[in-house]
């Protein structure tokens, strides 16, 4: 994870805005935050821009959180602030969300106010081109790069990833 990829975000910020990308203390923290959130609260989910590991991951997480909220905190909502204009398996997720959760989930593409320019963990808000967005729980997933072994071995490009030929997978 690239903790320096967003203004205002750092390893220290994960205590208030967990990325929860790796299982363990971060996922436990996100769970506690959801349990402690008031009924009627807002969860902001902020996926990273492409590329990143497990492209469906943030949207699978959205589905799990939506199920929890529908069951335990039905007045709450989720806003996905997504820098991307589309995401992996989007039509499947959107139709499932519409069927099971209705207006509980709102997805905002980058050009519709989803692109975040900075985060403010102290005040639990993020800034988009349309202004500040406050969340009771903010799951901010920072930009990513290839693993340490690949980086230390000099296999990565300037963007931090290992180039792959999409035809041959070499």
What are the functions of these language-model segments?
Residues 3-12, 54-58, 90-91:
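Short, conserved acidic/polar surface loops in the N-terminal third of protein domains
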Residues 2-6, 10-37, 134-170:
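FAD-site-proximal beta/loop scaffold in flavoenzymes
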Residues 18, 46-53, 81, 85:
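Conserved short-loop catalytic and cofactor-binding motifs
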Residues 23-76:
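Rossmann-like NAD(P)H-binding beta-loop-alpha module
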